[in-house]
Amino acid sequence: MRKLLRPFYERDTVLVAKELLGKYLVHHDGLEEKIGRIVEVEAYLGQHDLACHSSKGLTKRTKVMFGPAGYAYVYLIYGMYYCMNVVTEKEGIGSAVLIRALEPIKNIQDRTQGPGLLSKAMRIDSKLNHRDLLSNDFYIAEPNSPTDFTIIEKPRIGVHYAKEWANELLRFYIKDNPYISKT
């Protein structure tokens, strides 16, 4: 595996989202190394995207989104589930890619179909918020043998409040992969 470097994340959010598919999310939590293949993502395009957290402006919660690309943005939803995002583009944009589902590769026994489930299975929590994804214990890597697949584009899940942004085709997943989240 080859760890992705900062320039990968500093590009257009939609391009980064599509190119994250098939990559490996790696987390060594001090006990064991967990690896999952990214099979589903959603792109959030910055302050003008009404479904994006940064659309409300710079806050303590969203500060990481406005920082350098290649950092993790991890937040709690419904008071019980963590969601993991990858910050993209240049500083000040406020864009990110939500990791929605993983295919288990190593040391993952729990379900990974959905952002909360994958975070639980990978032991991702608020301690990893603002973590540099170029670290040695939490990163995304290119697999040694990439595989070909077809990318499906659909509207994002659970963003009906985002007006015209609710129907944008910004959810991407690997066609026919059994680990994509259920809608």
Curated annotation (Swiss-Prot):
One of its GO terms (molecular function) is alkylbase DNA N-glycosylase activity. The keyword DNA repair applies. GO terms for biological process: base-excision repair. Keywords: DNA damage, DNA repair, Hydrolase. It holds the Pfam family Pur_DNA_glyco. Its EC number is 3.2.2.-. CDD domains: AAG. The keyword Disulfide bond does not apply. PANTHER family: DNA-3-METHYLADENINE GLYCOSYLASE. Belongs to the DNA glycosylase MPG family. This is Putative 3-methyladenine DNA glycosylase. It comes from Legionella pneumophila subsp. pneumophila (strain Philadelphia 1 / ATCC 33152 / DSM 7513).
